[in-house]
């Protein structure tokens, strides 16, 4: 069976951090990120060290022993926000099932009724995909769209033909979350 590992940034080796940062600093990822700057290695390591006593969780997505992206969640005033990025060349099925798995993980682990995200207005593909997952726009300004999804909307979205196909594929993968046991929220 294929395996996907979500490995906490706090547990990555220096080489894994470099691999992850190389992906994060790609122009096509920076263009759609809320922070568009190129992140220097020393600043990245400093950021990661700050996660030890934080309510933010960041995971490298590893498939076939290669980092292919990252996913995160954090608590903002009691609300869970999440985000994700992938290498362009990553398998499209992996890019579809990891969000489903991770959102399910958030609902089950953190016992929240809603999950939130912020996305740049020009990131049309992400907005469309998030709507397919069950997210709805609840606030926007000239640059950012804020979306939320209830647990009920997520479960309902899984009944759509596209997500049903993805859910069938999800069962063909093993997932492992390797997490630093710091602050829990």
What is each residue range found by the language model?
Residues 49-54:
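Short loop/turn motifs at secondary-structure junctions and domain boundaries
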Residues 28-46:
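Conserved GNAT-fold acetyl-CoA-binding loop/helix
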Residues 14-21, 41, 45:
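An amphipathic alpha-helix signature
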Residues 1-19, 26, 58, 62-185:
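Acyl-donor (CoA/ACP) binding surface of acyl/acetyltransferases
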